[in-house]
């Protein structure tokens, strides 16, 4: 039973009549809202037309069974809506994943094309250095992987010493503007700095007189 002090839109008592408290039976709860911090339900009254439906505060009602039934129904509808939304999201994910994969393949292809382009556009300098290393290997001399100071355009300052590397003569040469000296095959030094090589030999030669025993 739902208690209500006023009959919805029908109880217009005359100014001199006393208002009597009447009871009306709630047939069905149709909707729910919160107004000014209070819960209200939209009610269908038993024995009255739909046009007589009214919003009533929860505190004025005495139909807890109908309220609980309505709240459970709302909860079930909310769960069903959430489940439907989750299913829709799952169906959309494979498409999104496929798009990402396709993008990845496209990026990989573009990267490979870019890599091929970079290789084809590499300057001829490194190739020239490689051929120089091959020529040096043909002579049996060991040349640093980065080439000698001469390959880097440096100017020799002084020959500091010489050594026999497995039967191959190399010079320890100090280049201008470089702190550390480096070993250079004699075959390279003889071509690049022949006068400096000759002076190096002359400084270390011992001359003997024909009259000495």
From Swiss-Prot:
InterPro entries: Chromo-like_dom_sf, Chromo/chromo_shadow_dom, Chromo_dom_subgr, Chromo_domain, Chromo_shadow_dom, Chromodomain_CS, Heterochromatin_chromo-domain. It comes from the Eukaryota. The keyword tRNA processing does not apply. Gene3D superfamilies: 2.40.50.40. Residues 1-24, 74-151 are annotated as: Disordered. Residues 24-82, 154-212 form the Chromo domain. Keywords: Chromatin regulator, Nucleus, Repeat, Repressor, Transcription, Transcription regulation. Residues 89-104 have a biased composition (Basic and acidic residues). The keyword Transcription applies. SUPFAM superfamilies: Chromo domain-like. GO terms for cellular component: heterochromatin; nucleus. Pfam families: Chromo, Chromo_shadow. Its main location: nucleus. Residues 105-115 have a biased composition (Polar residues). It is found in: Nucleus. One of its GO terms (biological process) is chromatin organization. Structural component of heterochromatin, involved in gene repression and the modification of position-effect-variegation. Recognizes and binds histone H3 tails methylated at 'Lys-9', leading to epigenetic repression. This is Heterochromatin protein 1.
